[in-house]
UniProtKB/Swiss-Prot annotation:
Protein name in the entry: ATP synthase subunit beta
Lineage: Bacteria, Pseudomonadati, Pseudomonadota, Alphaproteobacteria, Hyphomicrobiales
Pfam families linked: ATP-synt_ab, ATP-synt_ab_N, ATP-synt_VA_C
Membrane topology note: Peripheral membrane protein
Known function: Produces ATP from ADP in the presence of a proton gradient across the membrane. The catalytic sites are hosted primarily by the beta subunits.
Similarity comment: Belongs to the ATPase alpha/beta chains family.
Record-level Gene Ontology MF annotations: ATP binding; ATP hydrolysis activity; proton-transporting ATP synthase activity, rotational mechanism
């Protein structure tokens, strides 16, 4: 809600990221941005509470060191406004829309408030269409919906960020679509690496502009909780503008857990009583306000991929558990799989998607996915017997199932474009038809004669056959 702008108030109290401001006249509305100078920097405060008749409690979007009591503050009359449009592509902005990549001001098509209503039911589109990513394990077993929400679950260091980079790269190449990346409370080093990798891989041009495909909005680990709690909304606002222009946008959030974590810090600073495991009492409301805006309308779509850190690998923790309710597909990364050297370390039995239905993906795709899961599940149930008694005690049928399962496990790995510099093997984009054909053939036993090493880190099944011949020649 807009209020009369340019009213001035004075700071009465500063406690960390919380600043109390006293106004003589009309109080600024909740969620309004109010501004002050802190040294040479413009400091934005967001109104969070009204205390009594003349004081508001605000959350700072930057550090508050250097603020003094009695300092003058101006009400902008609006929520935080960020630049939107093609000019944001290839640029890095912070939570309040200021460029932080030292490439000059951001050319924009106007400013939009970061707080907005979700699209109404009549505006939303309900068509079900699959988004092909070129990553075999994803496309086959847990396909992504165009305009859907996807959760990437995994503990620390199992490859969430690399998978996100590969998705941005593949979607930019295959679909030519724009992406928006919101870095929420993650490592500054990773943010910097991502920016440079995008330039090196041709996703973005240095300094932005023509040829760039991805806008970056960062609020990193070292920022105050106010910035981390709002930066996802700033990124979403940029994505919403592209959607309203008729684009199919990809919106990446790394990491949605830090959004919850920052909300919990802000909540504690505002003196609210915590709920389960010390999280904010408004956890579900905060999550809903963000997630309900990520949707497909009749104009365009926002497909969102959210990395979700799982504290102590516990999926029942309130933060990941609240995210689950909003998702169309889950891609679960498993440490046990990454320890085998299989990347992407996606768990083929734990990952789910509402798109995996014969009515949406077709009968052949559905049956192949189920066959693959059946073989892998059988292998999983035999693992105890193998560990205790060894392979020799299995029946011939079970031995065959285990051999096929191990081939499938290895065939679910594939070299990534963004990891070429580390692995030395060129990345592979595998078409959906090739993926289905390859896995179906393995399940039907057409490649029982090939060694399992032939299936490791290849693209389509033809490459596995070539690799098998090469291995046989070397062995001879």
């Amino acid at each position: 809600m807009a209020t009369p702008a340019n009213q001035t108030g004075r700071i009465t109290q500063v406690i960390g990221a919380v600043v109390d401001v006293q106004f003589e006249g009309h109080l600024p509305a909740i969620l309004n941005a109010i501004e002050t100078k802190n040294g040479d920097n413009r400091l934005v405060l967001e109104v969070a509470q009204h205390l009594g008749e003349s004081t508001v409690r605000t959350i700072a979007m930057d550090t508050t060191e250097g603020l003094v009591r009695g300092q003058e503050v101006t009400d902008t009359g609006n929520p935080i406004m960020v630049p939107v449009g093609v000019g944001t592509l290839g640029r890095i902005m912070n939570v309040i829309g200021e460029p932080v990549d030292e490439q000059g001001p951001v050319a924009n098509e106007g400013l939009r408030p970061i707080h907005a209503e979700a699209p109404t039911y009549t505006d939303q589109s309900t068509e079900a269409e699959i988004l092909v990513t070129g990553i075999k394990v994803v496309d086959l077993l847990a396909p992504y919906a165009k305009g859907g929400k996807i959760g990437l679950f995994g503990g620390a260091g199992v490859g969430k960020t690399v998978l996100i980079q590969e998705l941005i790269n593949n979607v930019a190449k295959a679909h030519g679509g724009y992406s928006v990346f919101a870095g929420v409370g993650e490592r500054t080093r990773e943010g910097n690496d991502l920016y440079h990798e995008f330039i090196e891989s041709g996703v973005n041009k240095k300094g932005g502009g023509e040829g760039s495909k991805c806008a970056l909005v960062y609020g990193q680990m070292n920022e105050p909780p106010g910035a981390r709690a709002r930066v996802a909304l700033s990124g979403l606002t940029v994505a919403e503008h592209f959607r309203d222009q008729g684009q199919d946008v990809l919106f990446f959030v790394d990491n949605i857990f830090r959004f919850t974590q920052a909300g919990s810090e802000v909540s504690a600073l505002l003196g609210r009583i915590p709920s389960a495991v010390g999280y904010q009492p408004t956890l579900a409301t905060d999550m809903g306000a963000l997630q309900e805006r990520i949707t497909t309308t009749h104009k365009g779509s926002i497909t969102s991929v959210q990395a979700i850190y799982v504290p102590a690998d516990d999926l029942t923790d309130p933060a990941p558990a609240t995210s689950f309710a909003h998702l169309d597909a889950t891609t679960v990364l498993n440490r046990a799989i990454s320890e085998k050297g299989i990347y992407p370390a996606v768990d083929p039995l734990d990952s789910t998607s509402r798109m995996l239905s014969p009515l949406i993906v077709g009968e052949e795709h559905y049956q192949t996915a189920r066959m693959v899961q059946q073989v892998l599940q059988k292998y999983k149930s035999l693992q105890d017997i193998i560990a205790i008694l060894g392979m020799d005690e299995l029946s011939e049928e079970d031995k065959l199932a285990v051999a096929r399962a191990r081939k499938i496990e290895r065939f679910l790995s594939q070299p990534f474009f963004v990891a070429e510099i580390f692995t030395g093997s060129p990345g592979k984009f595998v078409d959906l038809a090739d993926t289905i054909k390859g896995f179906r053939a393995i399940c039907e036993g057409k490649y029982d004669h090939l060694p399992e090493a032939a299936f490791y880190m290849v693209g389509a099944i033809e490459e596995a056959v070539e690799k098998g011949k090469k291995l046989a020649a070397e062995a001879a």
